[in-house]
């Protein structure tokens, strides 16, 4: 079976091209919402090719981590587009090499729809550990849509998305948040009933 690492090593050279219609049709409009009201030292988990970078506010110091060196190499090229200071590290979100409370906040975009179900809680616990008490975690994720029509269209896309990205539309990240000891402050749809922005708080 192909691992997540192998998948992203394979798809990295094509990732931005394949994602282009979604990036410009959907994501660019919503990425800035992630950073509203955040400042200081921020973790971008699963930074990918660095698509969030143009939206990092100037006064942030961001550390982007990713499992795939090939995706990180693409992100490195995009670093110049960021107004913030950006450091990139090769790391697994379920085993972060940072001391507790290292960050003021963490963001992850389309990471949890890629992580297998049994990794969701361990990854959320790691984010909880490295973000300071009362800090924020923001997640932008695909969720299983309510409408039948969208579920049908997703069923058509699912085999390709699973093969290429290892992504699923059936992850229940919102439910795993409380299991990881985090508190949901806000959960709202930002693209139809497909993409959700979750704002979560670390207890403290
Ligand atoms: C769908 S891409 C999203 C990339 C980027 N956040 C974006 O918004 O375009 C998912 C990314 O998560 C990374 N990833 C998958 N599993 C990971 C893990 N366990 N730890 C860190 N990164 C991981 C992949 O290598 C890939 O770059």
Where are these regions (language model features)?
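Conserved alpha-helix/loop element of class I SAM-dependent methyltransferases that forms part
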Residues: 21-41, 51, 55
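Core SAM-dependent methyltransferase catalytic element
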Residues: 181-204
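Short alpha-helix
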Residues: 165-181
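Class I SAM-dependent methyltransferase SAM/SAH-binding core
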Residues: 41-95
């Amino acid at each position: 079976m192909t691992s997540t690492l192998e998948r992203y090593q394979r798809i990295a050279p094509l990732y931005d091209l394949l994602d282009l219609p979604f990036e410009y049709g959907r994501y660019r409009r919503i990425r800035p919402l992630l950073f509203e009201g955040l400042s200081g030292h921020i973790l971008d988990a699963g930074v990918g090719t660095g698509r969030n970078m143009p939206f990092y506010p100037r006064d942030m110091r961001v550390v982007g981590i990713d499992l795939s060196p090939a995706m990180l190499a693409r992100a490195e090229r995009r670093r110049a587009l960021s107004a913030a200071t950006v450091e990139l590290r090769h790391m697994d979100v379920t085993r972060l090499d940072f001391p507790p409370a290292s960050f003021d906040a963490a963001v992850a975009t389309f990471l949890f729809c890629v992580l297998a179900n049994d990794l969701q809680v361990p990854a959320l616990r790691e984010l909880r550990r490295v973000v300071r008490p009362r800090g924020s975690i923001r997640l932008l994720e695909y969720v299983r849509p309510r409408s039948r029509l969208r579920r049908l269209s997703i069923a058509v896309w699912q085999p390709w998305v699973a093969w290429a990205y290892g992504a699923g539309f059936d992850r229940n990240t919102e439910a795993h948040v409380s299991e990881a000891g985090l508190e949901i402050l806000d959960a709202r749809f930002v693209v139809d009933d497909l993409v959700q922005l979750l704002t979560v708080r670390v207890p403290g």
